[in-house]
Design a protein with these regions (language model features):
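Vicinal oxygen chelate
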Residues: 1-2, 69, 78-129
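Helix N-cap motif at beta-to-alpha junctions
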Residues: 15-16, 71-75
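Short amphipathic alpha-helices within nucleic acid-binding modules
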Residues: 22, 75-80
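Short acidic/glycine-enriched loop/turn segments that link adjacent beta-strands
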Residues: 36-40, 61, 108-110
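Short hydrophobic/aromatic beta-strand element in the GNAT-like acyltransferase core
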Residues: 42, 50, 68, 113-114
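Short, charged/polar surface micro-motifs in flexible loops or helix N-caps
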Residues: 47-50, 59-61, 74-76
Length: 129
């Protein structure tokens, strides 16, 4: 039924201007304001895909990762994030190193992954498989 459909995801934020700056200026993504719909952004990502971000006054951050960015060199990306003032999330139940990276590959437990949040508290990851 949906084969060939160009599916997309969306999530909310409490301040659309902070989101625009964070995703555009801080993370370097192509951010498009949807002029026809105030409070709506599209992140234009690879292969013509989009991620919709919308303003929600009573926003509650998701308790799960809303966005995963595959990367070739997680150490380099984590260093860049840290240099931009982004703090990585630490989870007591996970064995993360001093940088905040879960080294899953070396433990045969999946990919290397690190998490951080956007200004609205949504969880984002960088992941090296």
């Amino acid at each position: 039924m949906f084969k060939g459909s160009k599916a997309f995801t969306s999530f909310s934020v409490n301040d659309i201007n902070k989101a625009k700056d964070f995703y555009g200026k801080t993370l370097g993504l192509d951010v498009e304001e949807v002029k026809e719909m105030k409070g709506l952004l599209n992140l234009n990502i690879a292969d013509g895909n989009k991620i919709m971000i919308y303003h929600r006054p009573n926003h509650t951050p998701a308790a799960y990762t809303v966005l995963n960015f595959p990367v070739n060199n997680i150490d380099k990306i984590v260093d860049e994030l840290t240099n931009k003032g982004i703090k990585l999330e630490r989870y007591k139940e996970l064995e993360q190193d001093e940088k905040g990276i879960l080294r899953g590959k070396s433990m045969n437990k999946g990919p290397d992954i690190a998490w951080f949040t956007d200004p609205a508290g949504n969880i984002i990851s960088v992941i090296e498989e």
